[in-house]
């Protein structure tokens, strides 16, 4: 029986490239002259630090633009609240990876509500979808792509 997996992953190499490009842009921008501002990537978290809250917002927009250029979906960003320590502001931006159980249940419910002839099962941090026909699986992929679930999904391990 044909099957595929629904996963939510971030390409860490592209994430690192986007952070490096964002740091390069900070060094050339006029409005960030003589300002201590930087992006730092630690595992799946980008630590943003600047001298003002307004600059943090600008830096998030810079990062979002570079993520889009590198093909990383910005919907996977989860920006924590900004904290002020002394004259500097810090913010952690966590990139979500994997499908949490509540989101996996939403996906399974979405597939069942679409009345497609496929079965969906939750397997850890991914959802496996199996069906008799390849066309049913492709309809399932289309249904999930059109649904606004607030997280980017990839479809891999497609088997006939």
From Swiss-Prot:
Keywords: Nucleotide-binding. Coiled coil: none annotated. GO terms for molecular function: nucleotide binding. Pfam families: DUF520. InterPro entries: DUF520, UPF0234-like_C, UPF0234_N, YajQ-like_sf. GO terms for cellular component: cytosol. The keyword Signal does not apply. Belongs to the YajQ family. Nucleotide-binding protein. PANTHER family: UPF0234 PROTEIN YAJQ. This is Nucleotide-binding protein VV1636. It comes from Vibrio vulnificus (strain YJ016). The lineage of its organism: Bacteria, Pseudomonadati, Pseudomonadota, Gammaproteobacteria, Vibrionales.
């Amino acid at each position: 029986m044909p099957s595929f997996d629904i996963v939510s992953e971030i390409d860490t190499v592209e994430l690192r490239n986007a952070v490096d490009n964002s740091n390069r842009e900070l060094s050339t921008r006029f409005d960030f002259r003589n300002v201590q501002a930087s992006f730092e990537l630690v595992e799946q978290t980008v630590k943003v630090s600047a001298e003002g809250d307004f600059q943090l917002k600008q830096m998030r927009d810079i990062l979002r633009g570079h993520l889009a250029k590198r093909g990383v979906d910005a919907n996977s960003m989860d920006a924590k609240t900004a904290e002020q320590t002394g004259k500097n502001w810090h913010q952690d931006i966590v990139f979500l990876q994997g499908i949490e159980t509540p989101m996996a249940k939403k996906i399974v419910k979405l597939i069942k509500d679409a009345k497609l002839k496929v079965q969906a099962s939750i397997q850890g941090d991914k959802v496996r979808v199996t069906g008799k026909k390849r066309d049913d699986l492709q309809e399932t992929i289309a249904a999930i792509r059109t649904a606004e679930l607030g997280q980017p999904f990839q479809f891999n391990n497609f088997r006939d």
